[in-house]
Amino acid sequence: MTIKSRPTPKPLKVAIIGGGPGGLGAAIEFGKLDYVDWTLYEKKPQISETGGGISLQRHTWRLLELNGAAKNIHPDDFFRSPDGTSGQQRNGRTGKLLEQSSHPADTPPQQLSCRMVRAKLQAALLQDVDQSRVKTSKKLTSILVLPNGKVELSFEDGFTDDVDLLVGADGIRSFVRSFAFPSHKIKYNGQSAYRTIIHRPTAEKIDGIPQSPVFWQNTGGKYVFTCPLGGDDFEVTARIRRPIEGQHHVSWGRPFDFSTIAPEYDEFCEPVRKVIQLAAQGETQEFALFSGPRLESVISHGALALIGDASHPLSGAFGAGAGFALEDVYALTRSVDWARRNAEGLPAALGLYDQIRSPHYRDLYGVLDNFAALNSALLAEKLPVEEEIEERVRRAGESRSTWMYHYEIEKAVDKFLGATGEPGQVASVL
């Protein structure tokens, strides 16, 4: 009796668009699946990151441990407050401490939140990526879903590729998202952030600048954020409302002469003014802040999946974008692997991914809606300036949600798949 062997399934060809933390994380995780033939396409000439610092929250650290990149981050690369606190809120006009946050008591020491230069996180991820599969100077210009279900990609230099799965990791102004959901629009929200990295030893000579992540709050959406980073780096980020009309706004960092708007911070307390003066002498990058409504789905055409800022245009509202992107990657790659092991097709894998992640983003947008309502109610009271600042911090603190920093995507995925490996119906797991 002859037993026929099952035909070997064809490799799954995957294109990842974008070389940020989400795209690199996807490259790492897809690289662990021996049946996946993946390529990462980055439009810039090299994998690089712009901007100042980035927060690694508890969930981000856990995901870096899961994908293996945590080992590439040296303690000198990041800053943690020596007193064990996680951050401060201060009145930017007076310097008065209004709120101080601490880590939950059960946080493992290696997962305490920290702040580091964005490029160092990217470098840590890149170390675990097969760089022979990374193609730079590849700007995606066209996407076409073929009758056979494959996706045809065309790039600015004339190169083309046909893939089974297209992963959009191309950021807040995602080309892949625009193709998948052409009616979804993002827009400039009226605020811009100015990020500068200055010399830490010089900044630490300023009396009144704490060794902690500090938001120096003011009114009208204006604030300054200061924080040491790893090594000799110190971050200064200033946010302010800018004119919407008559300006060309871009979401990526572009050089900016910060001295031209530094006087707008003269109402801040002396330590902040001195830090602003240092920033005005440094190399500042301007980031116009864009955001958009929640996507009802993060998949399309049975062959496209969005991850990171492409899937949730939140404009950095939670300071945890890298963690969210790595959660997306974890859920997507486990969903793909589940479908493969259970002889299901790619549409089933993407449907599973969507069922895991879309409710999570629904809950995150719900948090933002609550904050918007709080802010509107506060503004309607027309309080004196000092009282408005204190009330905003107090009310935000009382209603603050931190569950997203302790969310365990691996448990959510396991619960969703169930002990038998069958998909079930479940809401987002907090």
What are these regions (language model features)?
Residues 2-12, 76, 86-88, 94, ...:
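C-terminal helical "tail/cap" subdomain of flavin- and related membrane-associated enzymes
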Residues 6-8, 160, 297-299:
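Short, flexible hinge/linker loops that cap or flank conserved catalytic cores
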Residues 15-33, 41, 167-168, 282-372:
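Conserved mid-domain beta->alpha element of the FAD-binding
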Residues 22, 46, 173:
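Conserved Rossmann-like nucleotide-cofactor binding loop
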Residues 38:
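Short beta-strand element of Class I
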Residues 50-128:
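Active-site-adjacent segment of FAD-dependent monooxygenases/related oxidoreductases
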Residues 50-53, 248-253, 317-321:
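Short, solvent-exposed loop/turn segments at secondary-structure boundaries
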Residues 69, 88, 106, 111-116, ...:
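Conserved FAD-binding catalytic core of PHBH/FMO-like flavoproteins
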